[in-house]
Amino acid sequence: MKRIMLFLATNLAVVLVLSVVLNIVYAVTGMQPGSLSGLLVMAAVFGFGGAFISLMMSKGMALRSVGGMVIESPRNETEHWLLETVGRQAQQAGIGMPTVAIYEAADINAFATGAKRDDSLVAVSTGLLHNMTRDEAEAVLAHEVSHIANGDMVTMTLMQGVVNTFVIFLSRFIANIVASNDDEEGQGTNMMVYFGVSMVLELVFGFLASFLTMWYSRHREFHADAGAAQLVGKEKMIAALERLKMSHESQLDGTMMAFGINGKRSMTELLMSHPPLDKRISALRSQQY
């Protein structure tokens, strides 16, 4: 219940902040909210603003959502190994030392998040630590470090911002046309039609746009695998992916899943955030990304 309330409060705060920003933009530019340019600005503020605020808050939100425990002073040999391995890989990749955390989960997984290359988070599940060899776990950590080094969080946020902007703009634009054709029904009915149509269209356009964002996510996974192979060797990365084929399905959600080592299965590859494991293994063996 606390987690739900925190989620709702956070989203309400984001909406209020973006509303204030939008009104300031309108006041400074003299732009009319009901104009086409005003609609586009509103879509951009909420489309990009929401995506970037989520990115800025991603470390804290990710840790809270999975109940992650940050390793500050290693309490055992495993935690010491995690810090030492991530630190060495971060130095090799030319990034700052990420915050390292462990979270309780049966699935073999890990994820990276954070707004900056030098202020990021790498978290691993207890399932990964219990079920993978050190070589396999090292490859998974290298995969996450590669995501950070490649700047995948920022590029995915930029893409999501563009997608959000067009989804909001097109939905509201079409809804406005539909509602304006019902002038004889009265102002109250027009507003209901407008919001009803815009909500339906946002769902439809958002679903269609997910094909693009998932394609890009799969594309970045191949490059993160390649980066991991450069850091620890191709055979270790292949061994880690082979191990994942026998694991539980990912329990991560949202951006954590997008930058995890293991994704959710889907009826169609087009809606998967990660390529099929066999394709990832084949790409590593052939070195074709």
Swiss-Prot record:
Membrane topology reported for the UniProt record: Multi-pass membrane protein
UniProt xrefs under PANTHER family: PROTEASE HTPX
Active site: 144
Gene name of this polypeptide: htpX
UniProt cross-references to NCBIfam families, sorted A to Z: PRK05457.1
Organism name: Vibrio campbellii (strain ATCC BAA-1116)
Main localization category: membrane
Required cofactor(s): Zn(2+)
Transmembrane segments: 4-24, 36-56, 158-178, 192-212
Short name of one Pfam family: Peptidase_M48
Localization in the cell: Cell inner membrane
Protein's name in the database: Protease HtpX
Keywords carried by this UniProt record: Cell inner membrane, Cell membrane, Hydrolase, Membrane, Metal-binding, Metalloprotease, Protease, Transmembrane, Transmembrane helix, Zinc
Enzyme Commission designation: 3.4.24.-
GO cellular component, as recorded: plasma membrane
Co-factor note (free text): Binds 1 zinc ion per subunit.
Disulfide bonds: none
List of residues binding Zn(2+): 143, 147, 221
Family: Belongs to the peptidase M48B family.
Broad EC category: hydrolase
GO biological process: proteolysis
